[in-house]
Amino acid sequence: MVTVEEVRKAKRAEGPATILAIGTATPANCVNQSTYPDYYFRITNSEHKTELKEKFQRMCDKSMITKRYMHLTEEILKENPSFCEYMAPSLDARQDIAVVEVPKLGKEAAQSAIKEWGQPKSKITHVFFCTTSGVDMPGADYQLTKLLGLRPSVKRLMMYQQGCFAGGTVLRLAKDLAENNKGARVLIVCSEITVVTFRGPSETHLDSLVGQALFGDGAAAVIVGADPTPAEKPLFQLVSAAQTLAPDSCGAIDGHLREVGLTFHLLKDVPSVVSNNIEKCLFEAFNPLGISDWNSVFWIAHPGGPAILDQVEDKLGLKPEKLRATRHVLSEYGNMSSACVLFILDEMRKASSNAGLGTTGEGLEWGVLFGFGPGLTIETVVLHSVPIKPGPH
């Protein structure tokens, strides 16, 4: 008779969890950041609030965002005037949209990842779905399973209401699953739409206005598995992962799901809380590897906003090019909450290949992925890049 220990050893993978494919998707509706204040104050019937509009214009100008994608079009907002008020009961209407559109956008990203992966979808053993946009039962994980036609026996995990750190969380959990279940192939989907957070401006709650200037819609999907087959093409290895709460940061970032939708609350000192705690996270992650030069690794940091990136850069003495991929995604898409770091991974491996660099991590061997969000929670994932094989000339 076999022992429990023998069963356990037989289930373990040999090598580290590896990202095998990445896919992304956005809604068709694209909004230009430079003209967004005019549109936002018009659609919310707030044009008489001229000082507040000027303040919002400055927020948008300083955001380092060029454009964003949003499911909420002018037509949808006109059909749902309660969305355009600051605190009007509107959760039912918001939920009606979110429970359909969040899985649908996630499906687009997942199909893109599955196509790149090149394996039959029947080989997907686990599904993680992550969103801060609406809640439902059965969840978006169930809806995605149905939309993609995955096996009924696929093992699902639904993560609601985690916020901006969760792109790191899903990689941490997928790593543990892939390494402890031989042959596992985990489909991760992070899908976020601003239908739950969009609201009119308030002169007394400027943190809500910050969210209106930063947040965008997007979905990203990755496939994670250990011991890649010859037919699979590894992109990054997941070496270690940690989560920590920054000390004395209670209330720094909060979100509350209420009759009025998801309200967003942010303290001014969030950039300094992140920058003051990030080196400790780096040291704990990289000390075992003998790495202490933060410019020697490639960087994927959740772009909560330009102030966070600027302070992290300054505190650690990072060269400007270290956060190029991060700033590029912020500029092109805005803050897409949990999906952002996966978009940045995609941008980095593509840019590395296009530039003819030696690895998926900008030619470097080791890298770090950071998620920052409510708590204040910091997710730290150590990545190892993969050599890029030169394509046929």
UniProtKB/Swiss-Prot annotation:
This is Chalcone synthase DIII. Pfam families: Chal_sti_synt_C, Chal_sti_synt_N. GO terms for molecular function: naringenin-chalcone synthase activity. Transmembrane segments: none annotated. The gene is CHS-DIII. GO terms for biological process: flavonoid biosynthetic process; polyketide biosynthetic process. Its EC number is 2.3.1.74. Belongs to the thiolase-like superfamily. Chalcone/stilbene synthases family. The primary product of this enzyme is 4,2',4',6'-tetrahydroxychalcone (also termed naringenin-chalcone or chalcone) which can under specific conditions spontaneously isomerize into naringenin. PROSITE patterns: CHALCONE_SYNTH. Keywords: Acyltransferase, Flavonoid biosynthesis, Transferase. Pathway: Secondary metabolite biosynthesis; flavonoid biosynthesis. It comes from the Eukaryota. InterPro entries: Chalcone/stilbene_synt_C, Chalcone/stilbene_synt_N, Chalcone/stilbene_synthase_AS, Polyketide_synthase_type-III, Thiolase-like. It catalyses: (E)-4-coumaroyl-CoA + 3 malonyl-CoA + 3 H(+) = 2',4,4',6'-tetrahydroxychalcone + 3 CO2 + 4 CoA. Gene3D superfamilies: 3.40.47.10. The active site is at 164.
